[in-house]
Amino acid sequence: MRIFFWKAAVAAVAGLGAAVQAQPFYLPTANHALFVKGGEPDFFAPTPGKTWESGCFGCVRTDRHQMHEGLDIKCLQRDSRGEPTDPVMAAAAGVVEYINDRPALSNYGRYMVLGHNIGGVEVYSLYAHLHSVRSDLKAGVSVQAGEPIAVMGRTSNTAETISQERAHVHFELNLFYSDHFAAWFKTHFPGERNDHGVWNGENLVGFDPRLVFLEERAEGTNFNLTTWLQHRVELCRVLVRKTNAPWVKRYPMLVAQNPTAQKEGVAGYEISLDYNGLPFAWVPRAASEIKGALKYRLLSVNEAEETLNPCRNMVKQVSGRWQLAPNGISLLDLLTE
């Protein structure tokens, strides 16, 4: 069973009381050009030959067919050799969950994951392409919001290295899919290595930090992460005949009440997925509310959203009818196994 280090973080800062629950996210570097009108080119590090949008979160690469699950934030400081020296800071109070100190094992290069409790929501921030991680940090160590945790770099294991000009920190905000990831990975990627256990990026589902930062700045202390997550745009809705989904216990704030299922018992769930595969709304269903015997059934597709953000390939059209694509089925397996 995985130890939830983020719970230790909550205890460590319990003296802050309600302030912990209202803790906003902070930008992970001193680059605050995101908050300057027209400052996006100074904030986002684009891919070679592309505009700043390619450094954003979303279907922003390869003509909208490749997902980029974070923000690439430009460096501000360099040493005499032109290498980045920007401190990377914790985006919120939390606990170190994982450090990969072997850049060759991931296209993230050297990266680390912090766990946070934001108003009761279990959130994980990820910082990648790091030059170095603070030497005293290891899994289980608490950090405060804005505390330096690493130095920006350009580490990676990809064939095309990150140039000095493009030096950046890749930053993500994520929810956590499943403690059963290792078994799922072995089934769906036979023969492939998983060097990072549950902290493999495939087991973290991102939401757009840019939108969070901007809305948080606009709303101040009125910003509520749960409400924000509950109002994601639906790409598709599916019905699953499974009742043991770990997500339901980890994120109960995203599960609706259904009197019929409460009375008769839960036989499955109706799940709303955004375009990145984040299951932001779950409705328990009783057996009397479920038609057919299929394990998974696609209920609806938001065609406008699928056209705008097709990069996850979770659904497909066959002879004019929408179906779950292999990627969509694989995701549902991860959520419900």
Put a short name on every predicted segment:
Residues 91, 137-143:
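Short, well-ordered loop/turn sites that connect or cap secondary structure elements
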Residues 17-19:
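N-terminal signal peptide c-region/cleavage motif recognized by signal peptidases
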Residues 22-110, 195-337:
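Surface-exposed, glycine-biased beta-strand/turn segments
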Residues 106, 111-114, 141-218:
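Conserved, short, structured surface segments that act as functional micro-motifs
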Residues 1-9:
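Bacterial N-terminal signal peptides that target proteins for export
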Residues 78, 99-102, 132, 154-158:
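Short beta-turn/strand-loop junction motif enriched in small, turn-promoting residues
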Residues 10-15:
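Hydrophobic helical h-region of N-terminal Sec-dependent signal peptides
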Residues 83-85, 91-134, 164-168:
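Zn2+-dependent peptidoglycan hydrolase active-site motif and core
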